[in-house]
Amino acid sequence: MSSNTPSEMQEPSIDTDKLSYEIFSILESKFLFGYDDNQKLWIPKPISPPASEPMVQPGDENSFPAIKNQRGKICILSIDSGGMKGILCGKALAYLEKALKSKSGNPNARVADYFDVAAGSSVGGIFTAMLFATRDNNQPIFTAEETWRFLADNGKRIYRSGAVKNGGILKKILKNGSTGSSSNGMEKAMKEAFTAGRRSLTLKDTLKPVLIPCYDLSSTAPFLFSRADALETDSFDFPLWEVCRATSAEPGLSGPVLMQSVDGQTKCVAVDGGLAMSNPTVAAITHVLHNKQEFPFVRGVEDLLVLSLGTGQLLEVSYEYEQVKTWRLKDWAKPMARISGDGSADSVDQTVAMAFQQCRSSNYVRIQANGSGLGRCGPNVDTDPSPSNVKLLMEIGEEMLKQKNVESILFGGKRISEESNMEKLDWFAGELVLEHQRRSCRIAPTVAFKQPSPKIN
């Protein structure tokens, strides 16, 4: 069996990396950091492709020598925005954690044990914080099962019931200019979740790198809350309850959040992270590709194992020309909001699938609903916290797991996989466990996480 030379360990391969690095570098520079000057965009130099690496089976007598020279894969979790539809993502997380326990033989296994980076937007950001926040720097506070239950139990505190009556939120905004605010209820729910005694947990109180976006009205640009940045300086460390409130501060449902870092040096006026990036998968991938301090041996997307959780399209709506040609502004508001959100998430999915190219099926899994046969969802399914809507979403979440997985094809739209979402999650859990086990055999560490300084009381 061939082994990697030192140069191969450090340099990306030309097969997938030049395309993927360029795509993600441009996306990161232009959209995450607002760079418009092409001179500031980082484009990698073309390099020679290394020899292909043989697949190593766990039972192979030569497995250990081969495994110890492998770079390993960085495991990434991404969770979309989606309001109350986030219950679907929570159901997928709960199933994944159950599969991890089964395949690892560890009844205490948690999602955070097996992922190296997590990104979440809006409700996905809340779930990310829940899964990776810790009070003892050892164990996550919440289980995966508790994510969707938290949303089901606290939905009325986050999304006011009155905002979804009489025609929906956008109609009320257009007609009255306001829907009221659920800020107080949301703030209380977030504080209860992310405190340790009298101390508010911050971004530093997470077990692994997390990325949670919001949109900063003061700079009119996306702002990304990052554990890595928080560990560098207190000027980028924020209380987790405020981060969660900021990323889920949907205009019209709750007021904007005036964010201030723990040292008071950084401020932003934050609203819903879903406005900045409804699908944060690209943010997570670019973070890994550009973070050589914590991920020193990553060459490109073939060194990543990515799970992206979305909610899919539950409203099967199509529009005919004769129907829309006479629409006025108020008629376009809600369809445009839905098209923008769904289109953005799908565009990211297509971009990621394009970057992974041939290793798409082995390195990237996207889980989301493909419609529902359980009855028609209401037009405000994403903001309706009523028991009936929660019950419906719980059932759709279970249905989603049994549905055939939907894959994005490069320049080919989407296709229905032969495997169900449940089977995809089972396979992915197996890959996570295998990667976790192999790391103890490798010469060099796959990851080298920054560690927070000891807390001073």
PLM-predicted stretches and their roles:
Residues S2-N457:
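Conserved catalytic cores and adjacent C-terminal regulatory segments
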